[in-house]
């Protein structure tokens, strides 16, 4: 009886210690996980509109990558450096309604910015770690996130 209580108590301690931790997100094959989101880079060159549409077709809830911290930006820079042929990618930040209000294509709030200048469509240049304005018809690789 004493051994059963000891084993039960040990299991309870382990359960309680793990219950506060975040579960690791199980991303589909080819996608990488970071902070409860999945990311994938594609070497397909697309303009901003086609890139966003492409991402929404990859996986339910997927959009062009949105960046909410310096750490997340570093993760995406590494993903691009290791997986894409070009040192830049579209990001989901743009003036979606042409009313001077910027928002992420996934409708997330803009809390973190590293803008080189204000623009309509933005591209992230990895070696400079800056976001730059680019005509929306420019073609660039794609990083999707869900």
Curated annotation (Swiss-Prot):
Tissue-wise expression: Expressed by the venom gland.
Positions of disulphide bridges: 27-38, 55-144, 121-136
InterPro entries: C-type_lectin-like (IPR001304), C-type_lectin-like/link_sf (IPR016186), C-type_lectin/snaclec_domain (IPR050111), C-type_lectin_CS (IPR018378), CTDL_fold (IPR016187)
SMART domains reported in the protein's UniProt record: CLECT
GO cellular component: extracellular region
SUPFAM superfamilies referenced in this protein's UniProt entry, alphabetically: C-type lectin-like
Major localization class: secreted
Residues in the signal sequence: 1-23
Keyword annotations from UniProtKB, A to Z: Blood coagulation cascade activating toxin, Calcium, Disulfide bond, Glycoprotein, Hemostasis impairing toxin, Metal-binding, Secreted, Signal, Toxin
PTM note: N-glycosylated; probably required for conformation. Removal of easily accessible sugars does not change its functional capacity, but removal of the core sugars with N-glycanase causes a virtually complete loss of enzyme activity, apparently as a result of major conformational changes in the molecule. Not O-glycosylated.
Gene Ontology terms for molecular function: metal ion binding; toxin activity
Segments passing through the bilayer: none
Residues of this chain annotated as glycosylated in UniProt: 47
Family note: Belongs to the snaclec family.
Function text: Regulatory subunit of the blood coagulation factor X- and IX-activating enzyme. The enzyme activates coagulation factor X (F10) by cleaving the Arg-Ile bond and is also able to activate coagulation factor IX (F9) and protein S (PROS1) by specific cleavage of Arg-Ile and Arg-Val bonds. May serve as an exosite by which the enzyme recognizes and binds to the Gla domain of factor X (F10) and factor IX (F9) in a calcium-dependent manner.
Subunit structure: Heterotrimer; disulfide-linked. The heterotrimer consists of 1 heavy chain (a metalloproteinase) and 2 light chains: LC1 and LC2.
Protein name: Snaclec coagulation factor X-activating enzyme light chain 1
Species: Daboia siamensis (Eastern Russel's viper)
Lineage: Eukaryota, Metazoa, Chordata, Craniata, Vertebrata
